Design a protein with these regions (language model features):
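Core transmembrane alpha-helical segments of multi-pass membrane transporters/permeases
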Residues: 61, 82-110, 136-137, 141, ...
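Hydrophobic alpha-helical transmembrane segments of multi-pass integral membrane proteins
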Residues: 120-155, 351-394, 398-407
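Juxtamembrane and boundary regions of transmembrane helices in multi-pass small-molecule transporters
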Residues: 2-28, 145-148, 166-173, 177-181, ...
Length: 465
């Protein structure tokens, strides 16, 4: 066994402490007046969220362990334990992963990225803008954030080489951070574009029967945390990573004709986007649209994703992880853990129906702090079970409370909160220190400018009193 595998790091010590506390809760006698399943549920939830947050074992292993332990200790009925598997969020992810494979395999993603970057000038500032725009544009057609990162970071590095930005140059770091944040942060405003959005949609449906529509979600979030956040990323890159191009940018657009597979996938994506945008009219969930698009990609004769591609490249681990996170939310409610925690947390928050601005800031702060403690993907699993109590305390509609969680997990402070961002900076050779300075600056810009704008926009749309 390598020596490094035996070193007890802070995450491993934390996971060990979490496991010990979970076992104590599981074996402890039930306090008077409590239902026995409250402590069992608390132990299971602490184990799952603690191990998801520390990452000492792969997330899918934690997810499978969660399902196994939940079934063994009978913490809830089977339909609650496995509620995540029947959620539309899970199947939206499933279909999106298949489409993501097709976008990469056919080369359409690379063609789209190259053509978009070729529309801009040869200066550093222009290419930073191009990288952000490509990241946002791909968010509409490629649901996987990790897929967008893996596709675009190599393009950013190739552009850096053409512009004369060698290792260690600010320009190289700037292009990588433009891609890393441009593929994640504005995409939070697009419902099917990342995992936390899909988890939130799934928990809202599982817990409250609420269905988010693509168009309404886009209208609420995209003008501010989509468009204005992209602009903030642009200026943050130029502030922290100023540089000037030295090389000559080659034309990046593909000159070869589109292949048959690229054309077919283009038609599939256009139809999929149209159905997503018009879901308020036809009433079909984005999940079933995404799943149908994935099935079309797999059909014999179309073969945008071959059997071998599906078997070797489909990210089953992500599906298991999302199912587990959604089921955690269901158990928080069914076991009574949510009620017990809410009864103790809510009195500590400065919530009053007479102070909507304070309530708005407090709910966003709650989401942001949760993201720091448990990473951004955990926020839509941890907080939604408390949403009804928070709605009562603030006087906000339930959907408004749920939407504030989006602003919470989109306001990230450190790179570790978002796994795709960590992957991007590793692929791009950006140190955690440099990336951390960037995300802190972006968080400050968000708090000072974008969140107040969001408050005004939400009030204009009628989401806030």
């Amino acid at each position: 066994m390598p020596a490094s595998s035996r070193i007890m790091t802070l995450p491993r010590w934390t996971a060990l402490a979490v496991l010990a506390i979970a076992v104590i809760l599981l074996l402890a006698p039930t306090p008077e007046g409590w239902e026995p399943k409250v402590l069992r549920g608390a132990a299971l939830i602490l184990f799952a969220m603690g191990f998801f947050a520390t990452g000492v074992i792969p997330e899918f292993v934690t997810g499978l362990a969660f399902f196994a332990v939940a079934s063994l200790i009978a913490v809830a009925p089977a339909d609650v334990i496995f509620a995540g598997w029947s959620s539309t969020a899970l199947w939206l992810t499933f279909g999106g992963l298949i489409v993501g494979i097709a976008v990469t395999r056919t080369g359409l993603g690379g063609r789209l990225a190259a053509r978009l970057t070729g529309l801009f000038g040869e200066t550093y500032k222009a290419q930073v803008a191009a990288m952000i725009l490509v990241g946002v544009a791909l968010s509409f057609v490629m649901p996987s954030t990790m897929g967008r990162v893996i596709l675009l970071v190599p393009i950013a590095l190739a552009l850096a080489d053409r512009l004369g930005f060698a290792e260690g140059r600010n320009g190289r770091y700037g292009l990588v951070m433009a891609v890393a944040c441009g593929t994640w942060m504005p995409a939070v405003a697009i419902l099917p574009a990342n995992v936390p959005n899909m988890v939130l949609a799934g928990t809202a449906e599982t817990l409250y029967g609420l269905h988010f529509t693509y168009g309404a979600y886009l209208l609420l979030h995209f003008p501010i945390i989509g468009v204005f956040k992209a602009i903030a990323i642009y200026f943050a890159v130029l502030m922290l990573f100023p540089d000037r191009a030295e090389g000559s940018t080659a034309k990046t657009a593909h000159t070869t004709p589109m292949t048959r597979d690229e054309k077919v996938l283009s038609y599939v994506l256009v139809i999929t986007l149209a159905l997503w945008a018009l879901d308020f009219w036809h009433g079909i969930s984005p999940a079933w649209v995404a799943l149908s698009a994935g099935v079309v990609c797999l059909l014999p004769g179309i073969d945008l994703v071959s059997k071998d591609d599906f078997m070797t490249r489909f990210n089953t681990a992500s599906v298991i992880y999302i199912a587990a996170v959604l089921s955690v939310a269901a158990i928080i409610v069914d076991s009574g853990v949510g009620r017990e925690l809410a009864a103790r947390i809510l009195p500590l928050l400065p919530l009053d129906p007479a102070t909507p601005a304070t309530n708005f800031a407090t709910l966003i702060g709650l989401g942001s702090v949760t993201g720091i403690l448990a990473t951004a993907p955990s926020v839509p699993a941890v907080l939604p079970p408390f949403a009804q109590d928070l709605a009562t305390a603030t006087g906000f509609p339930l959907v408004t409370v749920l939407m504030t969680f989006v602003l919470g997990y989109s306001t990230m402070f450190l790179p570790y909160q978002v796994p795709p961002l960590v992957v991007a900076i590793q692929l791009g050779g950006v140190s955690l220190r440099k990336a951390g300075r960037f995300t802190l600056l972006l968080a400050a810009l968000t708090i000072l400018f974008l969140l107040p704008l969001s408050f005004l926009w939400w009030r204009f749309l009628g989401y806030l009193p």
